[in-house]
Amino acid sequence: MSEKHPGPLVVEGKLSDAERMKRESNYLRGTIAEDLNDGLTGGFKGDNFLLIRFHGMYQQDDRDIRAERAEQKLEPRHAMLLRCRLPGGVITTKQWQVIDKFAADNTIYGSIRLTNRQTFQFHGILKKNVKPVHQMLHSVGLDALATANDMNRNVLCTSNPYESQLHSEAYEWAKKISEHLLPRTRAYAEIWLDQEKVATTDEEPILGQTYLPRKFKTTVVIPPQNDIDLHANDMSFVAIAENGKLVGFNLLVGGGLSIEHGNKKTYARTASEFGFLPLEHTLAVAEAVVTTQRDWGNRTDRKNAKTKYTLERVGLETFKAEVERRAGITFEPIRPYEFTGRGDRIGWVKGIDDNWHLTLFIENGRILDYPGRPLKSGLLEIAKIHQGEFRITANQNLIVASVPESQKMKVEKLALDYGLMNAVSPQRENSMACVSFPTCPLAMAEAERFLPSFVDKVEAVMAKHGVGNEHIVLRVTGCPNGCGRAMLAEIGLVGKAPGRYNLHLGGNRIGSRIPRMYKENITEPAILASLDELIGRWAKEREAGEGFGDFTVRAGIIRPVLDPARDFWE
C-alpha cells in the first residue's frame, strides 16, 4: 500500500442493489412478517431472501436433490440455516440442553454445527419452524441478531488461554463490544418475538440507516494463542496484560480472507497494527473503526467493500487518524506480543480456582450421533450433570469449562463412554473445513464431507516420510469466500469445481502469513502427488523446529505474499 497515492475517501458511482434493498427495508423489516404466512413456497421471496440474513439466517436448499426435484417440477427443498449470536462462544449447559432438543425435533438433519466463529448453527429449519427457533433462543437468553450480512458479526474471544484469569476479563470485553455494535432496530423483536410496535422512529446511531457496506468481523485475542485467527478479521483487540491483569489492547485492523476466483481486485490480507489503547477507550475505538468503515467503505461494488480494501484505498495513516479523531484518543505505540500457536489444547487443562477445562475434538464441528460414536448424546449427558458452561472454540471444538475436581471423573467417564475422547492424530486436530455441500449455495467443491478421508491420505503420506507424529495446518474451503480460512493455512485448498481445488502453500503455523496459489484447478490425486513430493523434502531438508509452511518459503518452493494488494496474484 502506498501512502503517497491514496485513493478517494468515498467511492462515487451507482450504488449496489444491496444498498437499495437496505434503504427500502424500513430498518430490516421488509415484508418478512407477511412472507412467513405464505404457504405457497418454502422460501422467502424478493428482498426478504437477503433481509433474513440480518436476522441470522440464510435460505438454502439440499443441493444433493436439487436436480431430482427440478425434474419432478418441484421447487428446491428450501430450508434455513440459523446462526446464534454467542460472543466468545460461551453457552451454559442449560441453554445447551434446549438447543439440543430443538435440533433433534425441528431440523431436517438433526445436528448442531459448531462454527469457526465460535457459535453454533442449525441447518435444515423449515419455514414453519423459523419463528419458533427465534422464540426458543429468546426463552434461554440467546438470539440470532446480526450474525450475518452487513453488520458486526459474532465477536470471537480466545477460548482456553494459558492465563485463565485473563479469559473472564477478555470475555467480558467481547460481550461489551458485541452489545455496543448491535443494530438498534426493533425489527427483530417485532417479527420474531411478537413485541409491540413502538411509535418512535428507529435510529441506528452506529450502523446507520443502510448499515455497513459489507460484513464486519471482530475478535478479542489473548496471546500467545492465536486460536481465533485474528488476521481473518476486520478488527482485532490483542489483550495486553501486566502482572496477570488486563491493562489494554493492541488494535489491528483490516484482515480478511475472501476473494473471487480470477478477480484481481480481490485478495486475502493480514491485519495492520494501529497501536495500543487503554481499556477505557475500547468501546469508543471499536465504534470509531466501524463508523469510519461505514462512511468510507465501497458501496458501489460489494466485491471490494470490506475494510481491507478501504484501508488500502485511503491509506493506513489516513484511516488510523480518522479513528483517532472519532474516538478522541491518540494511539500509543504497539506493546510487545507474540503468538506461538493456534490449535486447541485437546484434553484436560487445569485453570484457576482448582477448576478443570476439558477440550473435546469435534471433527468439522458437526455434532451428531455417529455409529459407535454418539457425540450428540454424550454432550447432552455431560450437560445434564455439569453445572458450568461449554465454550465453542474457533477451531470448531468444544470445551467443557470450569469442571470442579469433584466432578472431573464423572465428566471424563461420560466423555469416554460416548466416544468424545477417542485418540486423534495431531494432523487431524489441525485440519478444518467449512460446511460446503450439500447445504451451502456458494459451494463449488466438497469440504466438510471431503476432509476426513483426505486427512487419512495426508496422514499416510506423512507416515511414509517419517513425520506421522507431527502436523501441518490444513484447511479446506468449498469456495473462495473462504469460511474454512484456507487463506491462513500451511496447506490451503480452495474449491474451484466439483472434485477440483486451487492448492495454496506458504502460510505459517501461527496464522500470520497469507499462502500463495501453488497449483490451480487440480484433483485430489494431483494434490496428493504434490504433497508427497513436498512433505518428503520437508522431512529431509527442514531446519530444527521448522514448520512445513516456513520450509516451503525458505526452500524457494513458493514466494511469500508480502503485500497482498500488490502481489497476491503474482
Curated annotation (Swiss-Prot):
Look up the domain of life of the source: Bacteria
Entry cofactors: siroheme; [4Fe-4S] cluster
Any one Gene Ontology cellular component term annotated for this protein: sulfite reductase complex (NADPH)
The residues the entry assigns to the signal sequence are none
Q: Name one GO biological process term.
A: hydrogen sulfide biosynthetic process
Which HAMAP family does the UniProt record give?
CysI
Q: What is this protein called?
A: Sulfite reductase [NADPH] hemoprotein beta-component
Species of provenance: Salmonella arizonae (strain ATCC BAA-731 / CDC346-86 / RSK2980)
Q: What is the lineage of its organism?
A: Bacteria, Pseudomonadati, Pseudomonadota, Gammaproteobacteria, Enterobacterales
